Amino acid sequence: MTPATNTVLFVRSIFHPSDFSKASELAFAHALAIALFRKTELVIMHAGGDHVGDWAQFPPVRKTLEQWQVLAPGSPRSAVYEKLSMSVTKVSAKGDPVAASIRHIERQKPDLVVLATRGRHGLPLWLKPSIAQAIARRTTAMTLFVPSGCRGIVSMEGEIQLRRILLPIDDHPDSHEAVVRAVRAAEVFGDGTVEIVILHVNGEKLPQYVRPETQACSWKELRRKGDAAVTILEVAQNADLIIMATEGRHGVIDAMRGSVTERVVRDAPCPVLAARGETGFE
């Protein structure tokens, strides 16, 4: 970690709501891997119906960590914290999953929310307008969207691949935090030197930004003309992660509605990290 990137905290607490579907398995792997690398707190939540969920249906944390060969086979529950310095909590709640998630977010105040998405079949229920506004008022967390079936940074087998990050920047937002988050991701998860691709769409010149001093990254700058979302998705075909700035005044989720970021998340070939900024793609 370089002094320039140390000014922006990466992740100390993670929240991952799960519906126990196949589509959510890859998102779980990403949430677990980030918690493992950052030695931090992970809360996995399921809510719905008139009774609490079956604990056996929750994603198997210890079994997954054993498959990743970071825990010995048959390790006790206590080994997750004692051996790996990470805390994993499973929460089951009755009733509406969105309302339950909001309540938990208010208590936990996570730095990162990890969500599974279903691509062309629609974004999670969280992104409906009324729900989006409610969540936006209650959290400033970054949101990592992991499309079902995408090529993830983390595989179900625990393999890490992060070689190229796409970072679209606009004319007006302060790009510092987004750039720093890209560098931090490269330093933590990078497979060798990570290429950070700075993309600016429909501008005469590339907006100014500061490159933190780091040996973890190389840099490439692109300018393109055309529809912003379409262009970002075209360039993203060779990316492992997209980092999008969103409107800071309203929060990550609220800024997604009808935005370039929402369109990118729908069709992204890889995970998308939406992080708040002063202003962003609308």
Label every PLM stretch briefly:
Residues 1-10, 33-37, 102-154, 237-282:
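Gly/Ser-rich helix-loop-strand patches that form or flank binding pockets
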Residues 92-101, 223-229:
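Charged docking surfaces used in two-component/phosphorelay signaling
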Residues 61-71:
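A short acidic, glycine-rich active-site loop
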Residues 31, 100-101, 182, 228-232:
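Generic hydrophobic alpha-helical segments
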Residues 86-90, 219-221:
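Rossmann-fold cofactor-recognition segment
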Residues 2-60, 159-223, 235, 241, ...:
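Small/aliphatic-rich secondary-structure junction motif
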Residues 24, 94-95, 125, 225, ...:
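A conditional alpha-helix N-cap/helix-loop micro-motif detector
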